[in-house]
Structures are given as C-alpha cells and as structure tokens.
Design a protein with these regions (language model features):
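Non-catalytic structural scaffold of enzyme domains
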Residues: 1-179
Length: 179
C-alpha cells in the first residue's frame, strides 16, 4: 500500500482478506527510524489522517517501548508537492512555518509519514538541521519489498524495458511534466 493514510486505515483488513503478502509503508518507516535514532526521540510528519490514526506511534512503541514521539500534521505539504513548487522559496517558507513546532526539539530522527513528502526532503532537511536524520517510509518499504521478493525467489534481476502506469490525484498536466 503506497500511502501512509491508507496503510493506517486498511492494512490489517487487506492482510486478512488477501491470500498474498500485503506491505504497508508505516512499519518499514518505523523500523528504520528506530534503527537510526540514537536518542530515541523521533518526530513524525504526515497527513491529518495518518497523524490522527497514531499508527506510527503504535508501530514505534511496539518496536521500542521507551521511544519519545512527537507528531505533526502538515496539511499544506501535499498541495505544495502537487503544485510542483517543492523546491521553491514558497516551499521553504511553508516548510519553516509548518515545522516550527518541531524545530529545536530533542529529536534526532524525522519520519516523512506521507509518500508525497520525499519531494520536500531538501527543504525539510535544511530547516530541521543536519543533526536530524530524515526517513522516507516509501524508500524503506521498497527495500523491504525487495527483500521479500528475493526471499520468495521472485526478484527479477534482469533489466528488460519496463512498462509504467502512473496514477495521480493531482493535475495530469503537472504530473506529466514531472514524470
């Protein structure tokens, strides 16, 4: 499931109803954050739905019960990414305004709890500072999918010409210029 909000809402139902392994993006992101965090102070940014679900909190606490968690919903980030402005002065301003409550906290790790947010990695990292490691839940999930496929003998190591299908919730024209 390539969406944090959808993972939080339906992962267990999908696992129960499908005969195949179903990966969500929350558990891999949480595991990576625990692995890299030295202070066990971890921040989570995501959509309102993801943050409200507390799915990351549950995942982190199930791995390390003494982790300290700070969560922040960032409702302006998805429209910012979908507008194509992710590396502009506007993006830097919105990132700074939005993440101000997390700045200068004791966290050393920040989970990007939305698959749109990796496009904002640069302004987020610059604002939060070099002492904060930024974790992309999508990247971590791709790593886990690769391991699962390899373990099952299903990982394709050949490089045939791939076929891509893209879906977007935003402007098709904007997406086409990006993709």
């Amino acid at each position: 499931i390539a969406c944090n909000t959808a993972t939080a809402a339906v992962l267990e139902e999908m696992r129960a109803s499908l005969p195949i392994p179903v990966l969500g993006v929350i558990q891999p992101g949480a595991r990576a954050a625990i692995d890299v965090s030295k202070s066990r102070n971890i921040g989570i940014i995501g959509t309102e739905g993801t943050v409200r679900s507390k799915a990351y909190n549950k995942a982190l606490l199930s791995i390390h019960p003494k982790v300290h968690i700070e969560s922040l919903a960032c409702p302006k980030f998805v429209p910012l990414v979908e507008s194509g402005e992710w590396n502009s002065a506007i993006a830097k301003k919105i990132v700074a305004e939005t993440l101000k409550p997390l700045k200068n906290r004791s966290m050393d790790t920040l989970i990007l709890g939305c698959t749109h947010y990796p496009l904002l990695t640069e302004p987020i990292s610059n604002y939060m500072g070099s002492y904060v490691t930024v974790i992309s839940s999508g990247e971590e999930t791709a790593r886990e999918a690769s391991v699962l496929l390899e373990h099952a003998g299903m990982l394709n190591r050949e490089t045939p010409q791939p076929t891509y299908n893209f879906y977007t919730t935003g402007s098709r024209r904007m997406f086409k210029s990006i993709a």
